[in-house]
A protein has these predicted regions:
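PRPP-associated nucleotide enzymes
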Residues: 1-122, 126, 130-188
Length: 188
């Protein structure tokens, strides 16, 4: 039986988001697998499936807003916001900049976050967790509570383990395993 998780992997391969070859990652590490998340999340079916999967994961968590570091989180947070609205359980979307704007409002975080809000951080890939931890720090600094961290892909190169060790509820949709296999998370 083909589960929604397995279908997401099939679509990621079909859109070219999952690639095999020789790649240099943002961390500088070399890899024989690469996930080009925007090819999945900017595809109409991919955006719907990712948004739907993350909404399922967030169900019952009390999350009020979802977002993360630009640019990877932009289509993910938008998809989740749209799907949540369609389900009648709207979640706000927000974006964290690499650094505050140098003009206008000079914001680090775009969106309607307020202190005390329960938020989920999303990203396309977690390798060592740098982007996710920047987003976590930014929202926690304004008084928000991170109750869930969701990535489309966990590369299993330390980031996911560090999130869990630091007390965050981390859920990937897809695992890139050390043996080279790609495995769906059956939780959604």
């Amino acid at each position: 039986m083909n589960t929604p998780a397995d279908s997401l992997i099939e679509l990621a391969k079909k859109t070219g988001a999952i690639k095999f070859g020789e790649f240099t990652l943002a961390s500088g590490a070399k890899s024989n697998r690469y996930f080009e998340g925007k090819l999945l999340t900017l595809h109409p079916e991919g955006a719907c499936r990712v948004g739907d999967a993350i909404c399922n994961i967030l169900e019952g968590s009390g999350v009020q807003a979802v977002g993360g570091l630009i640019i990877g989180a932009i289509p993910i947070a938008t998809a989740v916001a749209v799907i949540s609205q369609m389900r009648g359980k709207p979640l706000l979307a927000f974006l964290v900049r690499e650094s505050p704007k140098e003009h206008g409002t000079m914001k680090l975080i775009e969106g309607q976050l307020e202190p005390g809000m329960r938020v989920a951080i999303v990203d396309d890939v977690v390798t060592r967790g740098g982007s996710v931890f920047k987003a976590i720090e930014a929202v926690e600094n304004i008084g928000c509570k991170v109750v869930k961290v969701v990535a489309i892909v966990d590369r299993h190169e330390g980031g996911g383990d560090k999130l869990i060790a630091d007390g965050y509820d981390f859920v990937p949709l897809i695992h890139f395993n050390a043996d080279g296999t790609v495995q769906a998370n059956k939780l959604f």
